[in-house]
């Protein structure tokens, strides 16, 4: 199964996450199929950037987002049917 999840990067006590499409059997920070964006929770304002068109494509192909990534996608207006225009 293909999943959309976060892969941790950064240093100790300074997390940084890549939002990736990966096989569910691969390690959290291991091999991935495509990088869709990133999430940086550290700083004055948490920074989130996602390629909405590619995320919508992978959702339409049956990729299952993790709970956290599903919340991010909903916040950004991405669904299985495509990108919602705001």
Curated annotation (Swiss-Prot):
One of its GO terms (molecular function) is structural constituent of ribosome. The keyword Membrane does not apply. Keywords: Ribonucleoprotein, Ribosomal protein. GO terms for biological process: translation. The keyword Ribonucleoprotein applies. It holds the Pfam family Ribosomal_S16. GO terms for cellular component: cytoplasm; small ribosomal subunit. It comes from the Bacteria. Belongs to the bacterial ribosomal protein bS16 family. This is Small ribosomal subunit protein bS16.
